[in-house]
Each structure stands twice: as C-alpha cells, then as structure tokens.
C-alpha cells in the first residue's frame, strides 16, 4: 500500500464511477491486508503484533489503549489514511468502528454503513487457522440501530479469521442486517434467521484479482442493489455477480455463485418496522430514464458513540454543496506541502501554533474553514495548485 499505488487506484476509481454514473466521491472503502505498507513495520511494531497474537483480548486492548503503541501500528496505514480520508472514509485513529453515511432506500427507511478495520494486525503471514486477527471491542460494539435504520457492515476479512469471532458474531446477529466481507476468493452468500422476523445476510463478496484462476477461483465482481420491499417492510438485496469468461475474454453473469439464477433476498428487518407505517406516494414511480427522476437521499451523520466528545462531533460540517468533492481533491490530489500552503494562506493555522500536523488535524482545519464559509477559496486554490503542477510536468 504505497502512495504510487493509491494514485493509480484513484484514477481507476474515477473511471469506474464514471462508467456506472456515480459521483467520484461517492465511494465507501475499508482497508485490507494489502493496504498497509509492510516496509514501515518496525522492530517494536513486530513485537507488539507478536504480543497480541500470543495473547488475546486483554493484550489487544492493552496495546491499543496506549497512544504510542497504537500510532506504531497505524503508521503502516499512512498512505491509505491520506487516500481514504479524501473519500470521507478515514480510519478511526483510536481503532473504533467508523460510520458517517446513511442512504434512504424507502420513505423513512435507511441503510447505514459501518466500516471496520480488520487489517490492523496484518503482517503478511497471518493465518486463518488458528485465527490470529482481532476486531476488538472498540470496533465490534457496533451501534444499536435506530427505528427506520438497518446496518450494513463493510470489512475485509470474514468472521472466521478473528480470534474474537464469537464476540463479533453476537453483535452482528443482534444489530446488523448485512455483513459484507472480502479477502477470500470464492464468493458465497448465506442468510441466517435470527428469529421469525429478523434475518442476517453474510456476504463473502470474493475478489476481483485472485491469486490464481480456475473453476473455483476466478476474476469476479458484484453489483449489489439495496431497496425497500414495501409489501413486507423489509430490506431487499439483489446481487448481480459477474465472472470472467476466458473464452470470450469478457465478464458475464455468474449463475453459480451468490444466489445463482435468483439472487434477490428479502431480509426480515425489524428496525424498519419499528418506524411505523411509511408514507408511500401512490403516484407512478419515475424511472431513472425520466427527467423527473428523484436522486437518492444521502446523509452524513456523526458516529453514534457515547464516548465521542461533543466538541469532536461538532467538527462535522453542514451539508455544503461541493464539500465532498473538495475534500477528495484536497487530500487525494494535493501534496502535503500544497495542503499546508492552503491552510496557512487562509489563516487556519495560528502563527504561534506548534501542534503536530497530521491528517486528523488537517481534516479538522479543513472542516473549520468550510464552516467559516471559505470553501470557495479552498476550491480556487486547489484548482490553481493542481494546474500549476500539471503545467510544470508538461
């Protein structure tokens, strides 16, 4: 996970977003075992990982509770951190779960994305059996959903890779509607009934680039649709798996994996029902092809955690037009020197300040400028600095 690779990833994501009609900043991401820079693992960091592997939950919390030890492990995610914060998917630097986005799928019916980092303990030789990775209580205490809201968890490693899988599973079964993981290269889906009116989908999404290609492991990707099933007041999940056909040298529908020929699932969703009857528009529903198509309703929401400082929560900017794209370009497309140049020019950094500058501090200052109404100036300076760099490269 080096910056040159993330630059290429950003270009690929921009092309992917354009191909499916998605805004380039409307991306959710979580880190995997290839997203950390293993060359940055120090001798001390190796000892910390070994200490946790040989121990358990108590040893994990002992290390993570220490700011210096935590920083040692997170230092390997420096480039990923800069990349992901541009997409508003930055890592929680206290190793907690991250959640700041929810999307309306029906009248008063929402899905909230919760992101987990399962790669913090990765070192390049991690094993599935016996499991040695951990999610940790700071992350697996997933927020209890509110009425009208179902939770979709995004994480890289499947459950059985964790030493604390049993504890994680308790929270998944009681609070999550869809659990999406990657890492393993053979896609699978399973729906478990928690009770008569409550389902939990475990979706192992597979990998676009497997370590080998044969009848079992091949190049795959999925298109997943989330919708509201009005008749049952439930979350509807339609999975459209795609697989590589080497004979045709193209991707095609995959009728063997992830639901086969009937990839639509209606999941019992008690949190939808808690919201009461939905106010349904009885008129004809516009299609995506009609001019009056209504865009999706997306909300940025603060992490719901009793331990979050109210002052910290207040740093979230209001829904300012252009904020998301400006955030992406500021962190992903500018050098660190350019970002500091903007912050200094706009008086975001006090002249007498000697506080250490990191991505978290840069993000706070960026959001402060937005709240002060200075987003247009950020955008103008970002455009100018990128243009100057491009001219210099010609």
What is each of the regions a protein language model found here?
Residues 118-184, 189-194:
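Active-site-proximal segments of metal-dependent phosphoesterases and phosphodiesterases across multiple
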Residues 9-17, 137-139, 224-226:
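Short, well-ordered amphipathic alpha-helices
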Residues 9, 32, 116, 153, ...:
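Divalent metal-coordination and catalytic microenvironments
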Residues 1, 26-34, 114, 152-156, ...:
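Extended hydrophobic secondary-structure segments that form protein cores and membrane-embedded regions
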Residues 1-68:
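Core catalytic region of metal-dependent phosphoesterases/phosphodiesterases
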Residues 226-372, 376-380:
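A short C-terminal boundary segment appended to hydrolase-like catalytic domains
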Residues 159-237:
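Conserved beta-sheet core of the metallophosphoesterase superfamily
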Residues 60-148:
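Binuclear metal-dependent hydrolase catalytic cores centered on His/Asp/Glu-rich metal-binding motifs
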């Amino acid at each position: 996970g080096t910056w040159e690779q993330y630059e290429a990833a950003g270009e690929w994501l921009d092309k992917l977003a354009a191909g499916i009609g998605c805004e380039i900043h409307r991306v959710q991401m979580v880190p995997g075992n290839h997203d950390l820079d293993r060359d940055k693992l120090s001798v001390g960091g190796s000892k910390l990982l070994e200490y946790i592997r040989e121990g358990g939950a108590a040893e994990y919390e002992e290390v993570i509770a220490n700011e210096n030890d935590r920083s040692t492990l997170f230092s390997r995610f420096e480039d990923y951190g800069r990349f992901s914060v541009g997409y508003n998917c930055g890592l929680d630097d206290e190793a907690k779960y991250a959640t700041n986005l929810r999307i309306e799928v029906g009248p008063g019916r929402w899905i909230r994305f919760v992101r987990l980092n399962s790669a913090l303990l990765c070192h390049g030789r991690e094993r599935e059996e016996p499991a040695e990775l951990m999610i940790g209580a700071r992350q697996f205490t997933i927020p209890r959903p509110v009425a009208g809201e179902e939770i979709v968890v995004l994480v890289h490693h499947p459950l059985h890779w964790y030493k604390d899988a049993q504890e994680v599973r308790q929270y998944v079964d009681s609070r999550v509607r869809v659990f999406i993981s990657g890492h393993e290269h053979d896609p699978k889906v399973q729906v478990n009934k928690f009770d008569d009116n409550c389902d939990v989908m475990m979706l192992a999404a597979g990998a676009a680039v497997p370590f080998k290609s044969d009848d079992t492991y091949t190049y795959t990707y999925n298109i997943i649709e989330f919708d509201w099933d009005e008749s049952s007041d439930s979350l509807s999940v339609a999975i459209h798996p795609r697989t590589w056909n080497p004979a045709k040298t193209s991707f095609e529908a995959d009728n063997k994996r992830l639901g086969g020929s009937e990839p639509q699932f209606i999941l019992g969703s008690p949190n939808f029902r808690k919201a009461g009857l939905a106010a349904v528009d009885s008129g004809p529903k516009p299609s995506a092809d009609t001019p009056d198509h209504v865009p999706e309703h997306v909300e940025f929401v603060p992490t719901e955690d009793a331990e979050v400082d109210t002052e910290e929560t207040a740093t979230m900017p209001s829904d300012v037009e252009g904020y998301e794209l400006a955030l992406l370009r500021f962190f992903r497309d500018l050098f660190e020197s350019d970002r500091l140049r903007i912050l200094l020019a706009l008086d975001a950094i006090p002249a007498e300040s000697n506080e250490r500058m990191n991505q978290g501090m840069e993000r706070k200052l960026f959001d402060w400028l937005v709240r002060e109404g200075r987003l247009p100036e950020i955008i103008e300076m970002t455009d100018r600095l990128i243009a100057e760099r491009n001219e210099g490269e010609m």
